[in-house]
Amino acid sequence: MEMEEAQEMSQMPGRDSPPPNDVSEENDEAMPIPEDLSASSNLQHNNRGDKEGLACNIKVEARCDEENGLAIDMMMNGEEEEECAEDLRVLDASGAKVNGSHAGGPDSKGPYSSAGGIRLPNGKLKCDICGIVCIGPNVLMVHKRSHTGERPFQCTQCGASFTQKGNLLRHIKLHSGEKPFKCHLCNYACRRRDALSGHLRTHSVGKPHKCAYCGRSYKQRSSLEEHKERCHNYLQCMGLQNSIYTVVKEESNQNEQREDLSQMGSKRALVLDRLANNVAKRKSTMPQKFVGEKRFSNISFEGGPGELMQPHVIDQAINSAINYLGAESLRPLIQTSPTSSDMGVMGSMYPLHKPPAEGHGLSAKDSAAENLLLLAKSKSASSEKDGSPSHSGQDSTDTESNNEEKAGVGASGLIYLTNHITSGVRNGVLPLVKEEQQRQYEAMRASIEIASEGFKVLSGEGEQVRAYRCEHCRILFLDHVMYTIHMGCHGFRDPFECNLCGHRSQDRYEFSSHMTRGEHRY
């Protein structure tokens, strides 16, 4: 068999082939067969042996050229795969070549490949450490870096290291300030594609995610989940969730029908939603919320840490109170008896208002409940003025929902509850009948009577002074603004949890000490 191949190789064009009579003349001579094809060129034989050795050398050189060409192709493919390491989809998905060897071929050594994984029957690779299945050796190589801790791509400006080149390129945009993703409807720009897709939803008309208890709508499911965690956990603690569920459900159904009528024939929302889905390269399960850059480089650290942190805490609490209540509603509430000409207007706008004869007999608990309802109405008036979405440069995915959820930072849970109960007033429509409103008012009064005790504050002249009491800390405030700032420091899940840094105290003494010292860690 080797002789026939040698003869065929010797008859290639450009080579001298022996004449046919030479074969018949030298049949009687012994024909040596070389044991090592690579060393056959060094053997000195007769004319026939030299030509056969030359043919064998040609065959060996052809095989070496094929192997060298295959190795060069694999090296070039390896360099290209290294450059495309950030895009895991550009790979050799067939699994035909793994470092120059074929799966199941004579050069492969069992089920293991040189990439450090286990070759599966379908051509994929399985990690030998955690068992994850990868579609190719490049994916497995990037995955192995999570086990070894290798981060070959390093930023030259700050020294941050990454496992993939795409993450490094995204990080470099932080230094350059480049924001390639821009909104075509406003001046908003961001660095991430998923942030742009979330911003495009702020331009859409509808809010598909609606709360089944209070009727509030959100554009993102994550905002709805946060709302349920804040609002309805508090309702369950107060025992009011079942009592107001039926009332608010009817109101939410009416609002739903009204929104459906307003959105019929509107194609803009559908186009924006499709555009947001097409722009998003990957799904954002939990949208990022940009809190803001904290720059401490210009601060002189001559004072103690408590002195440096305290102004920041006060500013944050004041901003939270202003964002929730608005500048108009932060003024102290002074009850004045309405004139006879205003009684008709007051009766139509505020059915819960009591006549002057009954107003003198109201206790402090009744007036506190009325103040809560008035605060909710003042909040609804201020929220209608700020209806347009914010198009700032922050990477926020749901600006309107974030502004609505800031309500939980600036005031107590009871005010937050009242704002949800009177959602019809906030929308400018009062669909509830008088009996349902009376039921809400009685529920509010009952909750206040259970949670609070009667008190009376007198001035130096003996006149009664309006006071606001924190039920958690048992502190009286003569100023409504200071009371609102203080209530903004309490958490919703736990009243003794700091709403600024999340520190949980055992009792009111530890909570007051924590707020006084200003030891907030972010």
Swiss-Prot record:
UniProt subcellular location: Nucleus
Q: Which UniProt keywords apply?
A: Activator, Developmental protein, DNA-binding, Metal-binding, Nucleus, Repeat, Transcription, Transcription regulation, Zinc, Zinc-finger
GO cellular component terms given for this protein: nucleus
Keyword Glycoprotein listed? The answer is no
Q: Pfam families recorded for this chain?
A: zf-C2H2
Region feature (Disordered) = 1-48, 96-115, 379-406
**MF terms (GO), sorted A to Z:** DNA binding; DNA-binding transcription factor activity; RNA polymerase II cis-regulatory region sequence-specific DNA binding; zinc ion binding
The protein's superkingdom reads Eukaryota
What the protein does?
Binds and activates the enhancer (delta-A element) of the CD3-delta gene. Functions in the specification and the maturation of the T-lymphocyte. Also interacts with a critical control element in the TDT (terminal deoxynucleotidyltransferase) promoter as well as with the promoters for other genes expressed during early stages of B- and T-cell development. Function is isoform-specific and is modulated by dominant-negative inactive isoforms.
Instruction: Say which family it is in.
Output: Belongs to the Ikaros C2H2-type zinc-finger protein family.
Q: What is this protein called?
A: DNA-binding protein Ikaros
Protein's organism: Oncorhynchus mykiss (Rainbow trout)
Q: Source taxonomy lineage?
A: Eukaryota, Metazoa, Chordata, Craniata, Vertebrata
